[in-house]
């Protein structure tokens, strides 16, 4: 599966973009990317702001979610690094598979993180340790960078999948360090 998957993904992507020429692709996909880049953060912000009102009472134990999130983020970081190494070694098909996998894991993380805010007790998940200022600085910078990484990641993937490799390289120079 590991050997076959990059080729299957490559074939699917080529079929999707084959029927539309480049200008039509941009006319369709650029507005979609821009819209998603605005809608997703707004939806996440709304869910986070109103999570006290939207809290889901559940008898299930979701205390494993922070560990799950750490595993997702750690695996994503490994995949991003591996993808960087692959493209430096000119293994573009495997690079594409690894980067799409990293994007999928990041998407699963976002969905799971929002879900965790709806099911976990907020009073027990707030950080109240002696490094509150440091924690808040890291948290706020993380939130601001996450706003930038979504459109950058979407445009990076789009330019790479459509074969616009110069544009892809220019965007990835910003996307990679922010995403990491």
Functional labels for PLM-detected ranges:
Residues 2-7, 17-18:
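Aromatic (phenylalanine/tyrosine) cluster motif
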Residues 17-180:
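Alpha-helical membrane insertion/targeting regions
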């Amino acid at each position: 599966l590991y050997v076959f998957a990059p080729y299957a993904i490559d074939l699917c992507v080529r079929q999707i973009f084959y029927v539309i020429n480049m200008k039509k692709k941009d006319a369709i996909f650029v507005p979609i990317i821009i819209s998603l880049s605005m809608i997703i953060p707004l939806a996440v912000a709304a869910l986070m702001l109103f999570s006290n009102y939207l809290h889901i009472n559940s008898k299930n134990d979701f205390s494993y979610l922070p560990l799950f999130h750490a595993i997702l983020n750690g695996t994503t970081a490994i995949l991003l690094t591996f993808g960087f190494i692959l493209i430096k070694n000119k293994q573009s098909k495997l690079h594409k598979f690894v980067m799409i996998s990293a994007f999928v894991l990041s998407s699963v993380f976002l969905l799971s993180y929002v879900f965790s805010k709806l099911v976990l007790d907020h009073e027990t998940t707030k950080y109240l340790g002696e490094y509150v200022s440091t924690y808040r600085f890291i948290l706020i910078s993380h939130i601001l960078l996450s706003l930038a990484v979504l459109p950058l990641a979407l445009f990076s993937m789009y330019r790479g999948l459509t074969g616009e490799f110069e544009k892809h390289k220019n965007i990835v120079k910003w996307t990679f360090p922010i995403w990491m």
